[in-house]
């Protein structure tokens, strides 16, 4: 920082030497990566705040129950489920190989993992609905020439368990006060607003050069991270399903 004069000939401090990445690398600068990482970390943290310890456990038990149910159904259809203990991921084999499953899954727009050694992998999460479960059952039943059994409510997956007692977590988690207070939409919105008011941004004043996570990130630029088209892409989706992503990557080259 150097001492200079402003347009009125009054003493003024100015930035005389800049070593910030954006000014050195210009369009090749990568400092936005810290903003991207911070955003996902904040979202994950607020997910924990909203659900709390009990909510997180309920979600986890729901995921595990669906995985156990699917494992039992697949074994009834003649598949071998090789993960004897699991949380949300199944490793599946069938004497007929993977092609019949692949064909049935593609017809319903479902992407699974097909290993070159002849087994199929799939993982479930909290976004999996009863309809999604019925579609998976349909795929594996059709591929094994079995009669599919469908469910019409989440109750079919409740109380199912396949985790050994020694692997069950016994230590408490998310016990800080903040994880016990904001479990409705209104409470959460007000909490986030209070946090926002504690921050300093371009809506209040100038911000110091170098504060890359404090620069203006308009909501319009951040909201799309929650869009299914961006964050819901299957990691093993075939290239014909990712035309939009390919265009974005080409534009960023």
Name each model feature, range by range.
Residues 104-107, 115-139:
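Noncatalytic alpha-helical scaffolds and linker/capping helices
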Residues 77-106, 124-127:
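Conserved PLP-binding catalytic core of the aspartate aminotransferase-like
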Residues 130-208, 212-220, 225-228:
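Flexible inter-domain linker/hinge segments
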Residues 63, 90, 122, 210, ...:
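Buried hydrophobic positions in well-ordered alpha/beta secondary-structure cores of metabolic enzymes
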Residues 80-85, 112-116, 206:
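Short beta-strand
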């Amino acid at each position: 920082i150097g001492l200079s004069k402003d347009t009125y000939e009054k003493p003024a401090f100015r930035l005389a030497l800049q070593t910030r990445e954006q000014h050195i690398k210009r369009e090749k600068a990568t400092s936005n990566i810290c903003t991207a990482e911070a955003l996902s970390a904040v979202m994950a943290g607020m997910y924990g705040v909203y659900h709390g310890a009990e909510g997180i456990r309920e979600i986890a038990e729901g995921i595990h129950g669906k995985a156990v149910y699917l494992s039992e159904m697949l074994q009834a259809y003649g598949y071998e489920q090789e993960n004897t203990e699991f949380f949300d991921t199944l490793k599946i084999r069938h004497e007929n190989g993977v092609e019949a499953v692949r064909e049935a899954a593609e017809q319903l727009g479902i992407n699974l993992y097909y290993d070159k050694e002849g087994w199929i992998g799939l993982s479930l999460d909290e976004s999996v609905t009863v309809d999604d479960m019925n579609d998976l059952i349909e795929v594996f039943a059709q591929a094994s020439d079995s009669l599919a059994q469908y469910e019409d409510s989440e109750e079919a997956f409740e109380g199912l368990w396949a985790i050994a007692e020694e692997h069950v977590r016994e230590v408490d988690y998310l016990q800080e006060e903040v994880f016990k207070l904001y479990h409705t939409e209104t409470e959460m919105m007000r909490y986030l607003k209070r946090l926002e008011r504690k921050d300093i941004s371009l809506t209040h004043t100038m911000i110091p050069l170098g504060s890359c996570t404090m620069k203006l990130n308009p909501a319009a630029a951040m909201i799309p991270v929650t869009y299914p088209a961006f964050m819901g892409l299957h990691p093993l989706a075939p290239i014909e399903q990712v035309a939009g992503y390919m265009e974005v990557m080409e534009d960023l080259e």
